[in-house]
Amino acid sequence: MRTLTLRILFACIACALLCASASAQETADTILMRYLRQEGLISYPARDIRIYTNGHDKLEDLFRDIDNAKKKVWIEYLIIANDSVGKLCISHLEQAARRGCEVRMMTDDYKDWERGYGMRTKEGMDSIRSLGIDFVTFDRFKFPWYNHVYRDHRKIVNIDDSIGYIGGFNIADYYVNGNPSYGGWHDTHIRITGAAVEGMARYFHQQYQYRGTGGKGKYTFARYLFDEDYRNVNEHTPKVVYFELGRANKQKKAEARNAIIAAFDAAQDTIRMVSPYLLPTHTVRQAMIRALDRGVHVEVPFPKKGDMDMLSYGNFHFAKRLLRHGAHVFLYKGSFHHSKIMMIDGTVSMVGSVNMNSRSLKWDYEAACFVFDRKTTAELDRIFEEDKLQCDTFSLEYYKREFPRKFRHKGWWVDRFLTPFF
């Protein structure tokens, strides 16, 4: 009996040691994937993932895909501008509609007032619908304006349920050629093919039904077309997990925030993050600081010249706080870096519309995805290293030397008190 007891005891100890060893060897992508599945988020296999960092290449491929569409083109952007690029996009959509494709287009109404395709007026909207485009604007902006603080900041496209686009580019001339006030435009978008497009298609359809004036009916994805994608999944298959922030489903209010926090908490070696705005919510800040405090190497570039002065004040002040916890911060020069990306430990990356500010993390409708693919993450890391060559190193001495006390004081106010509103 005593011998049996000792054997059981040794077996239990051995199992405990094996479990501890397995846990210690878990990589960031494994930890993050487990969290996302526990939250009910779906992992989709992708056939191919292509990265874009300039608007010309992205639009060239997008318009070619629209021209080759056979059944449907669903397109959702914050901005489709009333300029040469926006009109060219409408022209390609019109041709797709003439070929018999189902063409749906959705843009945010508030931004249309400022830079949109004449969509504020009924005449402007009717002129687009007359082209065969089923067009809606998200949440018409009207009195009382305080009821319309939640805007559609997403940038997603679904073509024939087999090609999808997601990222940070809108459809406007300055997303290709830049703006005189802050130089060129640098951004990140990805093109995904295969079964992984289902997630984007579902997000679009849900939004279209929730706030649009059309798009009624249940959406059905033809999974049988991608049976081979699902059958042949292995450890080398790129996998995509989408997450969003939106009020169509109350459970989605914190989904983006919690997913990003989980990514920070999963990191063991490196976090590389790009965002034009560095005014995250308190919980996201704490996750970043936790990663730094446990020795994770964190690199954060942001634009030296921003598109809004008030946000720039806050960016610099929060960057100073990150420095004090050991982060490596860089200032991107020469153009406006609008990317919203993150790479964790070289194993998983994030691309989408989510900025690191309260507006994106609490208020706006957003869409992004984690890409579980070392090849894609390595390519984003390579681009990140190239971008660092266009950066100045940010330090406390640099901050005090280059920016007057008045600027630094404004940054303190924005970072401390106005962060929840930006």
Can you say where each PLM-predicted feature lies in the sequence?
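Nuclease and nuclease-like effector domains acting on nucleic acids or nucleotide cofactors
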Residues: 3, 16, 20-24
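Charged, low-complexity intrinsically disordered terminal segments
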Residues: 21-136, 140-422
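Bacterial N-terminal signal peptides that target proteins for export
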Residues: 1-9
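Bacterial N-terminal signal peptides
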Residues: 9-17
